[in-house]
């Protein structure tokens, strides 16, 4: 029996017959059904991955220009001057949390542009 014969035979089967065939093939070759991979287009898992808001930005080193860093931290966190200064002085410290990946990268870039070192976790 050639491959063309097999394909034409499968094409002529009903949905119920195809389901039975799949079940037999799974048993014969010891295959288990798996869920579709989350990286397939249109998958809800991919959309959920993009909407995750679990990123945190940490100030790891305040750098030499603390005034600029305090201004940057104050700008991105909307904290007062005293709170921003305390955050910068106590580095390493948490700057912001509950962020999307894009928001976290924006904050990290602003803080680093002021001369500090920051990281996204």
Curated annotation (Swiss-Prot):
InterPro entries: Ribosomal_bL12, Ribosomal_bL12_C, Ribosomal_bL12_C/ClpS-like, Ribosomal_bL12_oligo, Ribosomal_bL12_oligo_N_sf
Gene Ontology BP term (one): translation
Provenance organism: Tremblaya princeps
Pfam families to which the protein is assigned, alphabetical: Ribosomal_L12, Ribosomal_L12_N
Protein known as: Large ribosomal subunit protein bL12
GO cellular component: cytoplasm; ribonucleoprotein complex; ribosome
SUPFAM superfamilies: ClpS-like, Ribosomal protein L7/12, oligomerisation (N-terminal) domain
Subunit structure: Homodimer. Part of the ribosomal stalk of the 50S ribosomal subunit. Forms a multimeric L10(L12)X complex, where L10 forms an elongated spine to which 2 to 4 L12 dimers bind in a sequential fashion. Binds GTP-bound translation factors.
MF-aspect GO terms: mRNA binding; structural constituent of ribosome
Residues making up the signal peptide according to the UniProt record: none
Similarity section: Belongs to the bacterial ribosomal protein bL12 family.
Biological role: Forms part of the ribosomal stalk which helps the ribosome interact with GTP-bound translation factors. Is thus essential for accurate translation.
UniProt keyword list: Ribonucleoprotein, Ribosomal protein
């Amino acid at each position: 029996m050639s491959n063309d014969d097999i394909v034409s035979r499968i094409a002529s089967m009903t949905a119920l017959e195809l389901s039975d065939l799949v079940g037999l093939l799974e048993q014969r070759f010891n295959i288990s059904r798996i869920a579709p991979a989350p990286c397939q287009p249109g998958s809800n898992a991919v959309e959920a991955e993009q909407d995750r808001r679990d990123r945190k930005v940490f100030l790891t080193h305040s750098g030499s220009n603390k005034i600029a860093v305090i201004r940057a931290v104050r700008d991105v966190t909307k904290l007062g001057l005293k709170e921003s200064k305390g955050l910068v002085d106590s580095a390493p410290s948490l700057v912001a949390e509950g962020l999307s990946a894009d928001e976290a990268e924006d904050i990290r870039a602003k803080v680093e542009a002021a001369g500090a070192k920051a990281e996204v976790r």
